[in-house]
Structure formats: C-alpha cells, structure tokens
C-alpha cells in the first residue's frame, strides 16, 4: 500500500487535531469501553447476591399494606445456556463473561405464583406449569396452596399475566378442566386471541420444536378455560382496588396488575400498593444491570426492551413493592437504581416472608 500523500497526511492531522490526539482518542475510547464493561460485570455480581432457591411446592406469607401475599414456589425451570436466552442482541463473549461473574452459566430460574387476600377475596396470580410440566422440578403450585391451607375452590379470581405455559398451565387440571372451579379467569383479549390463533414466535430465541410445544399447550389450556374468562385491558379495574397495565413485548397481551388500598380503584391508589410485573424480565442478575439485553422469550424483543426500561424506571422512582414471575423466590421486593452502573437496577428483596407448612 502506498504511503499517504502530504495532502492526505495534512488532512488527517487537522481532522484529529494532531496525530497524537488521534492515538490518544483511540486509547481513551478503548479504556471507556473497558470501564463500562467492568461496571456491567460488577453490577451483575451485585445482583447475583440474591440466589435462586431450590425445591418446589413451598409457600410463605407477608403483608403489604392491607394486602396479604402468599408467595408460591412452582419450582425451578431450565432453558439451557444463558446465551442466547439472555442478551442475544449483545455478544456471546459479553454474556458469557457476565454468566461467569454471576457464578452460573445455565439459564435456571424460579417459577413463582402468588395468592393475595385482598378486599375479602382470594386472588391467584398465574398458576405455574401444572400438569404441563416437562419434569418433576416444576408443577407444584397446588402443593404450595396445600402448605398455605388454601383449597382450589376458595380462589375467587385468577389474574393471568400472559399465556406462556409456565404461567397458564396450572390454571387447568390434567383432564383439562378449570383448576379453580369458583373463579373467573382474567386476561387480555389480545393474549387470548394470540394463543387461539397462529402465534408467531419467530423473533424469540426459543427452538422451533419448543415453539410448537408452546403453541399447542397454550391453545389447549385456553380452550379448557372457555366460558370462564373475563377480558381486561390497559387501565381497567376488574375488581375494586385492582388495575391492569398493558406491558407488551414479552407477549402481545402481557399485563401487569396493581393491587391498591382497600376499596380503591384509581390509578394512584393502585400504584401505592403492590404490583405484579409478570415476565418483564426473567433473570434479574443479568437483565437488571442490563435492561437493554434481549429476553429470549420475548415475542417482540425491541418492544420488550423499551417496556422493560420504562417500567423499571417507574418502579425505581416510585419504590412500589413488586411481585415477580421468575425472580428468586419469594420474588417480592422493590427496585432501585444501581450505584455501580447508572443505567442499571438492583432488586431489594422484602424481608419477613414467613414460610407456611400447614399441610
């Protein structure tokens, strides 16, 4: 290759403010990138202090204002390696470094459900895998209910965050009847239509085989609930003190629910209570420090990222108590901004969830 002409050399020198400045700028950029990645790894280590719990069929209870929450552990699910289930829009190297920093390379996480005693009713949020479980490690919400001394027929209302089988499956019995015979089942109309139609899961990182399984199981479970479903939409108050919030991306009709002060139905009151964030994210140790990392189960990844960033910012500002679908059980606490990574977050678990063993 020919050496730069004097004219080109002069242009490069002027553009950089001097050749040394070009070199220094490149070094500074590299150092900045390395510093940012180190901050991300440190934030992952901080988030990883909260560890997934083993076992299944457990229950504990605590009170948040006038809401009694019973946290149920359906079990532990395994989606394979961390990458590409998390961070497919990043790089494999960065995600694997984060996994090593977290001390876990597998995509393992808890599956949670909750019962709320609120306004004189017993309300179930999601139902775990139920009889659709792929193995004995999940499918134990009913065991948790027994530990809490709650019978299925005592549940007055069920609120479904979305139609993935680890949330929907436990709402029906093995012979495909409603598992909670006296309850109405609340969900988004768009979610029902999605699973009853021809769901497009092509933007997920889930294998084609498992996509087909999710479609078949989702439709089968939805069919079993026909005639018992009440549809809700963004901003609806299906019960006094309960408000639905549309948080699409994970699925088209993915909903959050807030449970506010007794008898209240305004949005402000709902935000002052406790909120279920569904599958806003799966693996808090990676996606709280890096909310812009794609979730492999998101139907619409870009929307999922935007909604995750929006909701996390709101929760950090409000300090509203949250319930979660997949954070380490019991998965109840608050979200705050990370002190290590400015655009990251940290989960602060609630204390005092007393384990129940009534049998």
Predicted regions and their residues:
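Active-site environment of divalent metal-dependent phosphoester hydrolases
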Residues: 57-58, 80, 132, 163-170, ...
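Active-site neighborhood of phospho(di)ester-bond hydrolases with catalytic His/Asp-centered motifs
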Residues: 124-127, 156-163, 186-188, 246-249, ...
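C-terminal motif of bacterial Sec signal peptides marking the signal peptidase cleavage site
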Residues: 19-21
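Bacterial N-terminal signal peptides that target proteins for export
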Residues: 2-11
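Metallo-beta-lactamase
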Residues: 23-150, 154-157, 181-184, 188-246, 265, 271-279, ...
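Cap/insert and terminal regions of metallo-dependent hydrolase folds
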Residues: 258, 262-359
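Active-site metal-binding motif and surrounding structural segment of the metallo-beta-lactamase
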Residues: 135-186
């Amino acid at each position: 290759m020919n050496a730069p002409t004097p004219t080109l050399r002069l242009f490069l020198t002027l553009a950089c403010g001097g050749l040394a400045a070009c070199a220094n700028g490149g070094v500074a950029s590299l150092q900045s990138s390395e510093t940012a990645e180190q901050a991300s790894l440190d934030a992952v280590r901080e988030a990883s202090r909260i560890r997934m719990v083993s076992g299944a069929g457990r229950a504990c209870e605590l009170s948040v204002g006038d809401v009694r929450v019973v946290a149920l552990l359906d079990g532990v699910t395994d989606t394979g390696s961390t990458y590409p289930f998390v961070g497919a829009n990043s790089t494999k190297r960065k995600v694997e470094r984060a996994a090593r920093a977290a001390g876990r390379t597998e995509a393992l996480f808890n599956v949670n459900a909750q019962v709320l005693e609120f306004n004189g009713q017993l309300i179930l949020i999601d139902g775990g895998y139920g009889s659709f479980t792929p193995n004995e490690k999940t499918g134990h919400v009913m065991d948790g209910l027994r530990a809490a001394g709650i019978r299925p027929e005592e549940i007055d209302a069920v609120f479904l965050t979305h139609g993935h089988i680890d949330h929907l499956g436990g709402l029906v019995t093995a012979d495909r009847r409603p598992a909670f015979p006296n309850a109405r089942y609340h969900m988004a109309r768009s979610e029902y239509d999605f699973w009853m139609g021809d769901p497009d899961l092509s933007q997920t990182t889930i294998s084609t085989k498992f996509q087909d399984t999710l479609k078949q199981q989702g439709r089968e479970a939805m069919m079993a609930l026909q005639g018992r479903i009440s549809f809700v939409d963004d901003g609806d108050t299906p019960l006094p003190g309960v408000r639905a919030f549309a948080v699409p991306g994970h699925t088209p009709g993915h909903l959050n629910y807030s449970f506010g002060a007794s008898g209240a139905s305004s949005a402000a009151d709902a935000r002052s209570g406790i909120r279920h964030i569904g599958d806003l994210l799966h693996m808090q140790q990676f996606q709280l420090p890096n909310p812009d990392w794609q979730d492999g189960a998101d139907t619409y990844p870009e929307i999922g990222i935007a909604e995750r960033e929006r909701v996390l910012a709101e929760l950090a500002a409000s300090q509203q108590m949250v319930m979660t679908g997949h954070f380490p059980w019991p998965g109840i606490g608050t979200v705050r901004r990370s002190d290590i990574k400015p655009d990251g977050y940290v989960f602060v678990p609630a204390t005092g969830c007393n384990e129940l063993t009534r049998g």
